[in-house]
Every structure is written in C-alpha cells, then in structure tokens.
Amino acid sequence: MSELSATHFLLLSAALFIIGMVGVLTRRNVLVIFMCIELMLNAVNVSLIGFAWELHQLTGQVFALFVIAIAAAEAVVGLGIVMALTRRTDTVDIDELRQLRE
C-alpha cells in the first residue's frame, strides 16, 4: 500500500471543486447552488490540508480551520437570505427570482 502524497489530496480536491462548479452552473434551485458552493469551499480545505501534509507543517491545517469557521458563518447568513427569499416569493427557483428583478 502506498503512502499518501499531495497528489492524492489535490486530485480529490480538484474532483470535489469541479463537481461543485458544475452544480453551481447547471442547477436552478437556490439551496442546491448553496450546497455546491459549500462543496467548493470544502475542496479548498482538502487542498490546504494536502499541502500541509506534504510539507509536514500545521499551517495549512490551521488555515483550513479558519476557512471552516468562515464557511459556517457564511452558511448562516446564506441560509437566512434563502429563507427570507422563500418567505417573500414562495419559490427557490433561480429563474423565477430573476423574473422578479426585471
């Protein structure tokens, strides 16, 4: 069995980021788009941890903890906005929300 290297972490991170980006670009539900953005943030965390693993330093892991804390705050604010939009418009479809703007 081979040892983990930064390549393994970066491949996983790239796959997660691409899945999240495709979700943001193709989905119409605001909640699904929000979850895909969170997936992209987690992909960044995996890459930070991978670089920290390769360099044998804790800096990347500490920075990943800060990103997790910021993502939690972003999740609270984002879900609050989504809930307010849903109460006001009775929809979570991005196309219908665009029509309200026009």
UniProtKB/Swiss-Prot annotation:
Subcellular location: Cell membrane
Keyword Glycosyltransferase: no
Single GO cellular component term: plasma membrane
Principal location class: membrane
Gene3D superfamilies cross-referenced by the UniProt entry: 1.10.287.3510
Any one GO molecular-function label of the UniProt entry: quinone binding
Residues annotated as transmembrane: 6-26, 31-51, 62-82
Keyword Flavoprotein included in the entry's annotation: no
GO biological process: ATP synthesis coupled electron transport
Class of the enzyme per the UniProt entry, highest EC level: translocase
The protein, known as: NADH-quinone oxidoreductase subunit K
